[in-house]
Amino acid sequence: MRMGIISEERDWVTDELKSKMEKNDIDPVIIQPSKIISYIESEVKFEQNNRSILDLKCAFVRNIGEGVEMFHRFDMLKYLENYVPIINPMDGIENAGNKFRTSFLMEVHKIPHPKTIVAEDVNKALIAADKFEDVVLKPLFGNQGKGLVRVKGRSTVAKLKALNTFKSTHGVIYMQEFVNNPNNVYRDIRAFVVGDKVISAMYRTSDNWITNIHQNGVPEKCEITEELSKIVLAAKDAVGLVYAGVDILESSDGLKVIEVNACPSWEGLSRISEVDIAQNLIDEALNYAKEY
């Protein structure tokens, strides 16, 4: 049996999946999207290194790269999905990768999330920012806590400058109300859900308001409560994923979803959790392929 790992670059996650596949007597196939050639003729073919990839049992998507090429690669994988089960589904990856879509889906499905305003007009954004005592600007597309800007207690002139700078870099201004932790600490929760079960969770704490592990956040064990499990499963299903890393904030009125990650790493979780996440993913992938 051959199982794919689609990633433009090798990283800790691809190596973990590859190793776990080998331990399950599965032949891992590392697929670089840039190396796939598609034949669109009477017989549709997708090949890498002159070998078809249509015989894969299923394939994990890890990283399809950046730039203009990314749009082609996304479309290519979406069509490959007609022949090979792709995990996560490409529609779900698209929903999770766009913060506007994620926020919209949280609201449609009545899942608690911070108040959010999205605008392209800087002056309108400035008026909207005044609705919040404290606000965070986030790139629509991005991860690992990169590109975040917190606007708190600034003068109107300083806010306008921050918004103009953000707009010139990112094009669209996505603003989210800053949620204070009731315990007066900088921390959030990353919960890892596979199928219909939240299998692991951690607090990410920091002396800075950006708590991502890639921004020096420190992982600590987090109990999987009924409240946490319920909101994480709802977020995963709303976005349309098989598995996910869901980021949660604690607030004075309960938990709130801030992000749903469709291609999450569990390197940080592996430091504090005894759960074999890679094995859980392989098992779920085989079940998904069986029902595909």
UniProtKB/Swiss-Prot annotation:
Residues that coordinate or bind Mn(2+) 1: 247, 259
An MF annotation (GO) of this entry: ATP binding
Top-rank taxon, per record: Archaea
InterPro entries named among the record's database cross-references: ATP-grasp, ATP-grasp_RimK-type, ATP_grasp_subdomain_1, Rp_bS6_RimK/Lys_biosynth_LsyX, THMPT_Glu_ligase
Pathway the protein takes part in: Cofactor biosynthesis; 5,6,7,8-tetrahydrosarcinapterin biosynthesis
Gene (name only): mptN
EC number, UniProt record: 6.3.2.33
Record-stated family: Belongs to the RimK family. MptN subfamily.
Protein source organism: Methanococcus maripaludis (strain DSM 14266 / JCM 13030 / NBRC 101832 / S2 / LL)
Function: Catalyzes the ATP or GTP-dependent addition of one L-glutamate molecule to tetrahydromethanopterin, producing tetrahydrosarcinapterin.
Protein name per its UniProtKB record: Tetrahydromethanopterin:alpha-L-glutamate ligase
GO biological process, one term: protein modification process
Assembly and binders: Homodimer.
Binding-site list for ATP: 138, 176-188, 204
Required cofactor(s): Mg(2+); Mn(2+)
Annotated cofactor note: Binds 2 magnesium or manganese ions per subunit.
Keyword Signal in annotation: no
Residues that hold Mg(2+) 2 according to the record: 259, 261
A cellular component annotation (GO) from this entry: cytoplasm
Binding site for Mg(2+) 1: 247, 259
SUPFAM superfamilies recorded: Glutathione synthetase ATP-binding domain-like (SSF56059)
The entry's keywords: ATP-binding, GTP-binding, Ligase, Magnesium, Manganese, Metal-binding, Nucleotide-binding
Transcription as UniProt keyword: no
Residues annotated as domain ATP-grasp: 103-286
